Amino acid sequence: SIPRETVESYFGTTPEAIAEANTRKNLIGSAKAGALGFNAHAANTVAAAFLATGQDIAQVVEGSNAITTAEVRDGGPASDGDLYASLTIASLEVGTVGGGTKLPTQAEALDVVGVRGGGDPPGANADALAELIATAALAGELSLLGALASNHLASAHEELGR
């Protein structure tokens, strides 16, 4: 979980506001839109990571079918009011050997994060790559939810002309 003070100082908003933004945007909004995934933009992170590491780009659809949750924890003095967020990805199919992972730039990207090759035991590097992608996707979800909850998203787009 993320301490309340960290949420307030880093995101400029409260855990309650982020949890509310998640409910409205990711859960209710996605349901109304008929989406299969209930997340803000996991596909952006998954697609970028897949391209960079030589994954099968066609698997972005499955890899971004994710559910983001956010709730305020009231678990006593140690975690009172902290934000708990998670991202559940049902099927994140990655590999660290063969196919596009042999391309020079993609192999270098796998080297940079220390997951090129099968790993020990075999498959350990693929597991680690999946964890890295999921962690990055959760960070992206929190960033967007924080921007929505603090009303910074629109002003950032106006400032950057996007």
Positions of predicted regions on the chain:
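Internal helix-turn-beta structural module
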Residues: 84-162
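Glycine-rich anion/phosphate-binding loop at the beta-strand->alpha-helix junction
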Residues: 1-98
